[in-house]
Amino acid sequence: MSGHNKWSTIKHKKGAADAKRGKVFTKLIKEISVAAKLGGGDPAANPRLRTAVDKAKAENMPKDNIERAIKKGAGGMEGVTYEEIVYEGYGPGGAAVLVEVMTDNRNRSVSEIRSIFTKANGNMGEAGCVAWMFSKKGLITFDKGLDFEQLFEAAIEAGAEDVSEEDEQFEVTTDPSSFIEVREALVAKGFSFANAEVTMIPQTMVALEGKQAESMLKLMDKLEDNDDVQNVYSNFDISADEMEKMM
């Protein structure tokens, strides 16, 4: 399995997605509001907002919640100022970790994130210590069952950089600037995607097992549980056999 969606696959298998839906909604509402504040409340003219709204719809967020979040952001979010920060560090076994934070209190966030790293036998590093290990890309995944050759041809024609076949899905990779264009071109041709997002893809992977693997999953869980954290990326890899031992 390719590593860049390893964590999302593990979360799905653990059944964590439904259990934490309320927290997911909270993070999405924050992203929608900030996107609307920065780029306006029209998703058609604001790519960041459009992506956030599409993600919220994919999580089955009620339409009213989405509209309220847009209205709040477009209205200026009086009295609330969020700062976007990326923290970097190392998890167990030297796995690289990127943590995207949206916070109204930088001091609180850095203290909490540092504590989470330390308790999981990791450590928070300086800016730039691991960012170079990742590339920002658009990633569109499709469940198997459709024709790979047709998807490949349509995706490349639409401007995708690569199309690959993984263990459980087909993956279309794009430049971030052409992500929405490629996604909509594929939808227009009848391809229904399982997930679509702009993400950070690691260039190399770090294999973990045993206690290190367990500690890494706990670190990822704790980071995502933090209210200020929007996204977490890592280059760890845990084999299917190792996952079976931990489930």
Swiss-Prot record:
PANTHER family on file: TRANSCRIPTIONAL REGULATORY PROTEIN YEBC-RELATED, TRANSLATIONAL ACTIVATOR OF CYTOCHROME C OXIDASE 1
Keywords assigned by UniProt, alphabetized: Cytoplasm, DNA-binding, Transcription, Transcription regulation
GO process terms (BP): regulation of DNA-templated transcription
GO MF: DNA binding
InterPro entries per the UniProt record, alphabetical: Integrase-like_N, TACO1_YebC-like_2nd/3rd_dom, TACO1_YebC_N, Transcrip_reg_TACO1-like, Transcrip_reg_TACO1-like_dom3, YebC-like
Compartment(s) where it occurs, according to its Swiss-Prot or TrEMBL record: Cytoplasm
Pfam families from the UniProt entry: TACO1_YebC_N (PF20772), Transcrip_reg (PF01709)
Family: Belongs to the TACO1 family.
Keyword Transferase: no
SS bond partners: none
HAMAP family cross-referenced by the UniProt entry: Transcrip_reg_TACO1
GO CC, any one term: cytosol
Superkingdom of origin: Bacteria
Protein name: Probable transcriptional regulatory protein Ppro_2673
